[in-house]
């Protein structure tokens, strides 16, 4: 793991999200840890570094459409998934992300 991936504190969570690919295909995944810059999506296969996905959270408050780019891929026994970085967003999306983040990490 690079230092860049571990430079910010992460909070363990178990939040279901809908992941939509650029081709429109969608599936559910679980966020295993999160910070305000990105998250780790568990049990995701077939994505490559630099792919962009759209995330929607079912958790209340809902997270309505945050774009994220795959930064790293893990395919090891016992752990498979992708680390994603949230893409630039407008002020309303930032507010929504912070509100959602505070709820899911219990702050």
Task: Say what each PLM segment does.
Residues 1-34, 96-107:
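N-terminal helix initiation/capping motif
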Residues 8, 42-48:
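Short, surface-exposed secondary-structure edge patches
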Residues 15-21, 50-63:
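Short conserved beta-strand and strand-loop elements enriched in small hydrophobics
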Residues 22, 36-37, 73-78:
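Short, conserved beta-turn/loop elements at beta-strand boundaries and strand-helix junctions
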Residues 29-30, 65-72:
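Short beta-strand-centered aromatic/proline hotspots
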Residues 40-43, 76-86:
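Short, solvent-exposed secondary-structure boundary/capping segments
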Residues 89-94:
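Short, charged/polar, Gly/Pro-enriched secondary-structure boundary elements
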């Amino acid at each position: 793991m690079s230092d860049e991936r571990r430079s910010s504190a992460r909070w363990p969570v178990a939040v279901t999200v809908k992941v939509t690919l650029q081709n429109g295909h969608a599936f559910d995944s679980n966020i295993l840890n999160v910070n305000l810059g990105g998250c780790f999506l568990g049990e995701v296969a077939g994505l490559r570094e630099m792919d962009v996905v759209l995330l929607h959270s079912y958790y209340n408050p809902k997270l309505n459409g945050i774009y994220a780019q795959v930064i790293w891929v893990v395919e090891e026994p016992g752990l498979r998934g992708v680390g994603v970085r949230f893409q630039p967003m407008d002020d309303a999306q930032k507010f929504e992300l912070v509100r959602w983040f505070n709820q899911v990490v219990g702050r």
